[in-house]
From Swiss-Prot:
Major place of residence: plastid
Name of this chain's protein: Protein PLASTID TRANSCRIPTIONALLY ACTIVE 14
Gene null: resulting phenotype: Seedling lethal, even with Suc as a carbon source. Impaired thylakoid formation in the initial process of chloroplast development leading to albino seedlings unable to grow photoautotrophically. Reduced plastid-encoded RNA polymerase (PEP) activity.
UniProt subunit comment: Component of the transcriptionally active chromosome (TAC) complexes. Interacts with PTAC12/HMR/PAP5 and PTAC7. Binds to SL1/MTERF3.
Gene label: PTAC14
Keyword annotations of the record: Chloroplast, Methyltransferase, Plastid, S-adenosyl-L-methionine, Thylakoid, Transcription, Transcription regulation, Transferase, Transit peptide
InterPro entries registered for this protein in UniProt: Rubisco_LSMT_subst-bd (IPR015353), Rubisco_LSMT_subst-bd_sf (IPR036464), SET_dom (IPR001214), SET_dom_sf (IPR046341), SETD3_SETD6_MTase (IPR050600)
Length: 483
């Protein structure tokens, strides 16, 4: 009975639009840009057999209530079938696809409990994993003895090429008839659907309005392209050449590795390893700075558990999330995953002046408490005020402040400091060639823009929105200062 219930939950679990099953064979997603041509122009952009299963009534998706958002589509049944027959289990969650990609959502109310609750189980046998440090070890070991792909992996830089090693294993998995990722790969985003900046063109990178980030992405693109040219030359064996016949295919695989890799410590028997892992189904969990889920390794049966937080009330339809990179600014999230947010509580800007405001006064105005690394907002004291969000928390961390328990703040001096800090913020905004409003209009006017182009515009817009939020927060601060 328990297994029947878990299968019922799984019927809504897998979000995807297949790229096209054709007689049981699916062509791999094709990247959109020609890297060799772009390189000559000074630009550096960047089969899967279906399982035969007998009809089974529980595989039919149950009639569900209308989604709170009409933009969300339920998952393709094939997505959960290929996992269920391989011991993947999901409890009380469903996978859906929206305009911004895939996500995992609660299919029923999850009441708060004293202990964390398992919502997903994925066995080790379905993962692609590699040890973080040399010597490279795979769990499970899918590379036959003597296969040249191991020599290619062994030639990578141990310090910086972790993504290339995972990409090589991913491509090798696609080439094996009996490997799960040959099926699962059909549900991965194609190159024109992926927001990773590894796939960005020079035109896309120019929209970032961030020279440092542009330089970093160009270096990564060059590193990956050079590696492909070195190891996929005309003289390589066919078993290697067919893995990535063109650089676009290889860069797409590296982008998948970067955006879907999870690093964690595992134990198999007595062997404890720090692994880089590509975990199917768990890689559909989106990011949040206030996640309601976390990942846990269960060593007794070599399972990865996705667990909901203890004591947290989750309503039906609420998205299940994890925190990808705690404590990282938007530029790091953009470099690694290809997304940003205007409410990142860890974002920061550099102030060059000497003006400072009183820290404790600023925190008390917005009901922010805790140590700097653990700031939180007490919404109960805000009486419905929705102004405070992650950007205000970030402002409390990034604004120049002073604190002295023996000296109270002088309102006139605080207002002077507020004005000087606001002026510096306005100068930062004036240095950008566009405003946040213009960026939003540009996004609204693009009906079918490239994913990487839209991602770049959002990044610069979110930066300006963050600076604008700091200006507004300083306005509220000086208005609420006690005389």
């Amino acid at each position: 009975m328990a297994s029947s219930v878990s299968l019922q939950f799984l019927t809504n679990t897998f979000i995807s639009k297949p790229q096209g099953f054709c007689n049981g064979i699916v062509s791999a997603p094709r990247p959109r840009s020609n890297l060799l041509r772009d390189r000559q122009n000074g630009v550096r952009p960047i089969k899967v057999a279906s399982i035969e299963t007998q009809p089974f009534p529980l595989f039919q998706s149950p009639a569900s209530e209308e989604s709170s958002s009409s933009e969300l589509e339920t998952a393709d049944p094939d997505f959960y079938k290929i996992g269920y027959v391989r011991s993947v289990r999901a409890y009380g969650v469903e996978f859906k696809e929206g305009p911004d990609g895939f996500g995992v959502y609660a299919s029923k109310d999850i009441e708060p409990r004293r202990r964390a609750r398992v919502i997903m189980e994925i066995p080790l046998e379905l993962m692609i994993t590699i040890r973080q440090k040399h010597p490279w070890m795979f769990f499970p070991d899918i590379v036959p003895i003597g296969h040249p792909i191991f020599d290619i992996i062994n030639s990578t830089d141990p310090e910086i090429d972790w993504d290339i090693r995972l990409a090589c294993l991913l491509l090798f998995s696609f080439d094996r008839d009996d490997h799960f990722w040959r099926l699962y790969g059909d549900f991965l985003p194609a190159a024109d659907e992926c927001s990773s900046l590894l796939l960005a063109t020079e035109e896309d990178l120019a929209e970032l309005q961030d020279p440092d980030l542009v330089s970093t992405i160009r270096q990564q693109q060059k590193r990956i392209l050079d590696f492909w040219e070195k190891n996929w030359h005309s003289g390589v064996p066919l078993k290697i050449k067919r893995l990535a016949e063109d650089p676009e295919r290889f860069i797409w695989a590296v982008s998948m590795a970067q955006t879907r890799c999870i690093s964690m410590q595992t134990r198999v028997g007595a062997l404890v390893q720090e692994l880089n892992m590509m975990i199917p189904y768990a890689d559909m969990l989106n990011h949040s700075f206030e996640p309601n889920c976390f990942l846990h390794w269960r060593p007794k049966d070599r399972m990865l558990e996705v667990m909901s937080n203890a004591g947290q009330d989750i309503k039906k339809g609420e998205e299940m999330t994890i925190n990808y990179m705690p404590g990282q600014k938007n530029n790091m999230l953009m470099e690694r995953y290809g997304f940003s947010t205007p409410v990142n509580p860890w974002d920061a800007i550099k102030f060059s002046g000497d003006s400072r405001i009183h820290l404790n006064s600023f925190l008390s105005v917005f009901n922010i408490y805790g140590l700097p690394e653990e700031y939180y907002h007490d919404s109960e004291l805000s009486r419905g005020d929705t102004f405070v969000d992650g950007a205000v928390i970030a402002a409390a961390r990034t604004l120049p402040t002073w604190s002295d328990i023996d000296l109270p703040p002088i309102p006139s001096a605080e207002r002077k400091a507020v004005k000087e800090l606001q002026d510096e913020c306005r100068k930062m905004l004036a240095e950008y060639p566009t405003t946040a409003e213009q960026d939003q209009k540009l996004l609204d006017s693009m009906s079918e823009a490239r994913t990487t182009f839209a991602t770049a515009v959002k990044y610069r817009m979110h930066r300006k929105m963050f600076i604008g939020k700091i200006i507004k927060a300083l306005d509220i601060y000086q208005e609420r200062l006690l005389y």
